[in-house]
């Protein structure tokens, strides 16, 4: 829709103010738009941001531009120490979302009488940006998690043994995190929900402290309750589309697979990573027949998704698993039952890297 021409504003200061805030809003929208385009690959967000930017452009009449006087603008060249603290792209995006929202609010207030169409557009865009900012935040978190997942080598899955005291659990996981493991999957099928919640909260905190991913096994409700990075599901758990609808696109979704058809199905459904195994017999699931190295070799050729070989892997048989094509492994007993979990974690990491 075309913006109706407006008569020159009698108060030059208001015209200058409108001009400056139109510039500010359009520039800020472009910063966010370019991050959505190049950083997030989100065409849907780019289309919306471009539309808003062009709508404001149609309201940027010559009468506003002609009132511009950069030579006498006391705000030219001003900066703030916080600008030097924007180390991550998201910091830049968040700052520009706030910048646009503030500029739009100023336009609403000062354009209400001289240019009601501009005021209405500014209000509509401001409220839209509040929602879009949340979407960008979630997309950014999801992208960061997936980048971190790509760099993972070693995932520690916790034991379900009911006699493992909290302190022993936390001490073991903490030692492994200090050694440099990339990811922890919380698995405990024997504890009460309250015990699981207590343990998951502490483990999530430890993982955040050490910059590792934290995944909850099976329990989407628990993953959401502790703000985990994702959830890992077995073949008999919720379908992928249902699980994704619950955890959102910003969290990771993993799926265990035992043969190629399951792997291909999980990838097609949109899982972020896969478990491949059990490679060897394991005390965790003694009833499950090990699939050996043949499926590991198949998986290495069948998918570009990150995947973890799992099942009875330890330092003595790891090289054979690597030779079969595995770049990532998930272990339970090798670390959880180790007398020196930090040293064992280091050994495994060195062998993988």
Swiss-Prot record:
GO cellular component, one term: cytoplasm
EC number: 2.5.1.3
Key words, A-Z: Magnesium, Metal-binding, Thiamine biosynthesis, Transferase
Cofactors: Mg(2+)
Catalytic reaction list: 2-[(2R,5Z)-2-carboxy-4-methylthiazol-5(2H)-ylidene]ethyl phosphate + 4-amino-2-methyl-5-(diphosphooxymethyl)pyrimidine + 2 H(+) = thiamine phosphate + CO2 + diphosphate; 2-(2-carboxy-4-methylthiazol-5-yl)ethyl phosphate + 4-amino-2-methyl-5-(diphosphooxymethyl)pyrimidine + 2 H(+) = thiamine phosphate + CO2 + diphosphate; 4-methyl-5-(2-phosphooxyethyl)-thiazole + 4-amino-2-methyl-5-(diphosphooxymethyl)pyrimidine + H(+) = thiamine phosphate + diphosphate
Gene Ontology MF annotations: magnesium ion binding; thiamine-phosphate diphosphorylase activity
Family matches, as InterPro entries: Aldolase_TIM (IPR013785), ThiamineP_synth_sf (IPR036206), ThiamineP_synth_TenI (IPR022998), ThiD2 (IPR041397), TMP_synthase (IPR034291), TMP_synthase_cyanobac_bac (IPR016229)
Cofactor binding remark: Binds 1 Mg(2+) ion per subunit.
Record flagged with keyword Magnesium: yes
Alphabetical list of PANTHER family matching this protein: THIAMINE-PHOSPHATE PYROPHOSPHORYLASE, THIAMINE-PHOSPHATE SYNTHASE
HAMAP family (UniProt xref): TMP_synthase, TMP_synthase_cyanobact
Protein name, per record: Thiamine-phosphate synthase
Organism: Prochlorococcus marinus (strain MIT 9303)
């Amino acid at each position: 829709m075309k913006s109706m021409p407006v008569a020159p504003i009698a108060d030059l200061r208001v015209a200058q103010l409108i001009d400056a805030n139109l510039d500010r809003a359009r520039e800020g929208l472009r910063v966010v738009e370019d991050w959505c385009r190049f950083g997030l690959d989100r065409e849907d967000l780019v289309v919306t941001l471009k539309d808003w930017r062009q709508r404001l452009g149609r309201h940027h009449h010559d009468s506003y531009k002609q009132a511009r006087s950069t030579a006498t603008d006391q705000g030219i060249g001003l900066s703030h120490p916080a600008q030097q603290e924007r180390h991550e792209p998201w910091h830049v995006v968040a700052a520009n979302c706030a910048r646009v929202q503030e500029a739009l609010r100023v336009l609403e207030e000062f354009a209400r009488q001289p240019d009601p169409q501009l005021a209405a557009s500014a209000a509509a865009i401001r409220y839209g940006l509040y929602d879009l900012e949340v979407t960008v935040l979630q997309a950014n978190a999801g992208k960061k998690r997936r980048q971190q997942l790509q760099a993972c080598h070693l995932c520690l899955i916790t034991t379900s043994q009911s006699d493992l005291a909290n302190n022993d659990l936390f001490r073991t996981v903490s030692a492994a995190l200090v050694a440099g493991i990339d990811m922890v999957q919380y698995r405990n099928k024997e504890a009460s929900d309250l015990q699981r919640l207590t343990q998951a909260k502490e483990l999530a905190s430890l993982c955040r402290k050490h910059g590792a991913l934290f995944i909850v096994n099976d329990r989407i409700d628990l993953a959401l309750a502790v703000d985990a990075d994702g959830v890992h599901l077995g073949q008999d758990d919720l379908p992928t589309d249902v699980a994704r609808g619950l955890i959102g696109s910003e969290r990771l979704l993993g799926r265990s697979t035992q043969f190629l058809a399951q792997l291909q199905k999980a990838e097609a459904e949109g899982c972020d990573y896969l478990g491949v195994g059990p490679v060897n017999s394991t005390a965790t699931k003694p009833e499950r027949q090990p699939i050996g190295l043949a499926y590991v070799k198949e998986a290495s050729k069948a998918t570009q998704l990150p995947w973890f070989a799992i099942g009875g892997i330890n330092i003595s048989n790891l090289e054979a698993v690597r030779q079969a094509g595995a770049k990532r492994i998930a272990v339970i007993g090798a670390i959880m039952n180790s007398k020196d979990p930090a040293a064992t974690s280091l050994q495994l990491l060195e062998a993988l890297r």
